Amino acid sequence: MTENKSFKESHPLDDFISDKELSNTTIQKEKLTIEQQKQVDTISKQINPLDNEGLLAFGSDLQKQMSQFSHQMLDEVQSKDVGPIGDTLSDLMSKLKSVNPNELNTDKPSMLKRIFSRAKSSINEIFSRMQSVSAQVDRITIQLQKHQTHLTRDIELLDTLYDKNKQYFDDLSLYIIAAQQKKLQLENEKLPQLQQQAQQSTNQMDIQQVADMQQFIDRLDKRIYDLQLSRQIALQTAPQIRMIQNVNQALAEKIQSSILTSIPLWKNQMAIALTLMRQRNAVAAQRAVTDTTNDLLTANAEMLKQNAIETATENERGIVDLDTLKRTQRNIIETIEETLIIQQHGREERQLAEKELQQLEQDLKSHLVNIKGPNKQS
């Protein structure tokens, strides 16, 4: 930001006025150019001695222009509120921060299903949110471009106001120099003549003319002071205009930086982060597929080994196991032996039964014989 002193030192007419008190400002006429001196002489002739009304109007047009200029400056400052620009920039920063690339960098254990479904869903959600924010950022960008256009116009307008203010300063400086030149002329030439004439005359009006001239010189001195005040206002206005311009320029540069740097960088970084996340998920998916393939190969190899062992074992076995043959033979022998025993028991029982039957038959015959004998005797 340019300091007030630099504006003052940079002005071409500042060298004509010393750094004493404002009311005691003196003119360094030797630093005037020939053209400026001609202008001063012309302006000085506008001051007619004892013309109080003309003295009151001396430089008043410039002061009126200064007053109008001050109102224009006030309107410019009041109508250009930079608050919305700051709010728009803050809104932009808020939108840019609402989607954090770190959200794409979550390292958590995941299964194959999570990688292909949940992770994909998470990326899509963030991508959808990023698209929404990007659309909002684009709308904010349009607002910022409008603000930048207004700021650029304001800067150009302030340049015009600065040039006008500089012209007021230049003109007031010449009017002050002309008035001071006229004052010196009246004090050194006209007033002594009137004083000498009054001393040599007995006419009281000559004495009144001396008093009137002294009062006119006093009014001229006060008029010079008023013009110096106006000039000082113009001098102080210059850095104020530049400060407003600097603020507008800084805002315009900030907006341009946001539009041309921050926003494209944000979009690039989000695209890069999303691409890296997709790559990482692809690698994780490939790793999961590889791990699953290895697990399947290992399981299949283990199953093949078990099947081979069992097959070889079965191949080495006979159709009928020896133990089975032994157990079968033992069962057959036991069956034969039990059958023989049963047959022997059956034979013995039959023999016993035959003996009993023979005995029964014999008993029956004997009984029958006994029954026939008594019948014959009777």
UniProtKB/Swiss-Prot annotation:
Source superkingdom: Bacteria
- Write out the similarity annotation: Belongs to the TelA family.
Protein known as: TelA-like protein SAB1262
InterPro entries named among the record's database cross-references:
Toxic_anion-R_TelA
